[in-house]
Amino acid sequence: MVRPRKLMILAGAAAAGGVVVRHGRRASRGHPMPGGILVGDAVVYDTLSRLLLGPFVARIAADVATVAPDGARVLEVGCGPGHLSIRLARQHGLEMTGLDLDPAMIARARANTDRAVNRGGRRPSLLVGDVAALAFPGGSFDLVVSTLLMHHWADPTGGLAEIARVLRPGARALIWDFRPGVRPHPFGPRHAHIPDPVDHTRGSRLRVVKATPWPWPWRLTLNPADPTGRADKSP
């Protein structure tokens, strides 16, 4: 199985904060599932993600909740059908903003939100947008999160720089993505050539503090930018 890992990022330079990133796709159409399969229909992707990613989303939500301050303003980049944003808003009381490049996916996320809030809880804000040009003022968020998508961004370093910009001083970024060097997949050969996510932090005002095992993905912890671009990796 292709294993993702999490990046925990604290913004450096002018914004000593952090965000979570998970959005922005390359020219390819469709939404990535584990193993590199691209699903082109938002409804089909929503159904598959419920069936295949439910435990993963639950673990991520629990992990985010341990990091986010009470009532924190949180941006999810690449929210897809909204499962993580909805869970974090309803169950953990976070002020969630979910962002996705695909209008059809945001429509699906809004429909899922309508059903979820009927059972009570906070409602996330869901918007169409691109990590390459985040439509938020600087210092807007206490936390940014993203799952399994950074390797699809056209400009990962630029996306991380945008995340650093919208983080408030002292905030964090949590990013889950696949490890480099995974075996090729017949439906997603690009996953055989995934670069190390740490490489994209150089020049983005973010730096990796450590990489540690997470229950089944990997987690990278990033702190304020180091001008040397060094990263400490823990097995």
Put a short name on every predicted segment.
Residues 143-154:
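A short SAM/SAH-binding and catalytic strip from SAM-dependent methyltransferases
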Residues 1-34, 230-235:
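Short amphipathic, positively biased membrane-proximal segments
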Residues 132-143:
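A short acidic, Gly/Pro-enriched loop at the edge of an enzyme's catalytic core
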Residues 52-70:
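Conserved alpha-helix/loop element of class I SAM-dependent methyltransferases that forms part
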Residues 75, 81-133:
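Class I SAM-dependent methyltransferase SAM/SAH-binding core
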Residues 157-169:
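A short glycine-rich, Lys/Arg-flanked "PGG" loop and its adjoining helix->strand segment in the class I
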Residues 25-38, 48-53, 174-227:
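C-terminal alpha-helical "lid/dimerization" subdomain adjacent to the S-adenosyl-L-methionine
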